[in-house]
Swiss-Prot record:
<keyword id="KW-0378">Hydrolase</keyword>
<comment type="function">
    <text>Bifunctional enzyme that catalyzes the enolization of 2,3-diketo-5-methylthiopentyl-1-phosphate (DK-MTP-1-P) into the intermediate 2-hydroxy-3-keto-5-methylthiopentenyl-1-phosphate (HK-MTPenyl-1-P), which is then dephosphorylated to form the acireductone 1,2-dihydroxy-3-keto-5-methylthiopentene (DHK-MTPene).</text>
</comment>
<keyword id="KW-0028">Amino-acid biosynthesis</keyword>
<dbReference type="InterPro" id="IPR006439">
    <property type="entry name" value="HAD-SF_hydro_IA"/>
</dbReference>
<keyword id="KW-0479">Metal-binding</keyword>
<comment type="similarity">
    <text>Belongs to the HAD-like hydrolase superfamily. MasA/MtnC family.</text>
</comment>
<dbReference type="InterPro" id="IPR023214">
    <property type="entry name" value="HAD_sf"/>
</dbReference>
<comment type="pathway">
    <text>Amino-acid biosynthesis; L-methionine biosynthesis via salvage pathway; L-methionine from S-methyl-5-thio-alpha-D-ribose 1-phosphate: step 4/6.</text>
</comment>
<keyword id="KW-0486">Methionine biosynthesis</keyword>
<dbReference type="InterPro" id="IPR036412">
    <property type="entry name" value="HAD-like_sf"/>
</dbReference>
<dbReference type="GO" id="GO:0043715">
    <property type="term" value="F:2,3-diketo-5-methylthiopentyl-1-phosphate enolase activity"/>
</dbReference>
<dbReference type="Pfam" id="PF00702">
    <property type="entry name" value="Hydrolase"/>
</dbReference>
<dbReference type="GO" id="GO:0000287">
    <property type="term" value="F:magnesium ion binding"/>
</dbReference>
<dbReference type="GO" id="GO:0043716">
    <property type="term" value="F:2-hydroxy-3-keto-5-methylthiopentenyl-1-phosphate phosphatase activity"/>
</dbReference>
<dbReference type="InterPro" id="IPR023943">
    <property type="entry name" value="Enolase-ppase_E1"/>
</dbReference>
<protein>
    <recommendedName>
        <fullName>Enolase-phosphatase E1</fullName>
        <ecNumber>3.1.3.77</ecNumber>
    </recommendedName>
</protein>
<keyword id="KW-0460">Magnesium</keyword>
Amino acid sequence: MGIRAIVVDTAGTTTDLNFIQDVLFPYSVKALPDFLEQNQHNVLVENCICDTRDIALEPDADLARVTEILQQWVSEDRKATPLKTLQGLIWKQGYAHGEFKGHIFPDFIEAVKRFSEQNLRIYSFSSGSVDAQKLLFSHSDGGDLTEMFNGHFDTRTGNKLDKQAYCNILNTISLSPKQVLFVSDVIEELKAADAAGMMTCQMVRDSKQRTGEFRTISSFDELLIE
């Protein structure tokens, strides 16, 4: 049957986690107050504000309180969809203004080109919004990589720790589980993908990283698909 598609995690796998934590997250925290104030009547932003109130169980929270909630979620690394949507919108401004470029590991930049030449389908699955993923790969320090991808998945597909999310991906891309390889640095995500029947591989870029029973690689250079 063989592998026909590769689904990659982002932070820690294709992207340095430090770029997310030290550049993108602080930027979104700093920009949130002004962004919400200036865009609160935009339909998408307004929906995110309402969803934040609902999730926080604070239906009467004013804009300042909503901002506090969102900033707290960033510090807790919460995977709440309204936060991830707003972060994507804020980062779009940052990329557009040239305030940073998306960090992508060089070995993935080379590998994604190789996979594309092999006619393998490439997808990304992240807790960051689809828009944020597209921004990361289109404004990367390796150039625009978006044409190499066949699609992106985020929290709307499901929680990355839940088997059902990977079943949903399989249904969307219409491939059988053994035709799809999921690559991530997080053991719990690999367990969920494995439970859905997917092939799995753990990216171990740090020698101190926790590993399990999964096949491991330290670079995409080691991932050879026949």
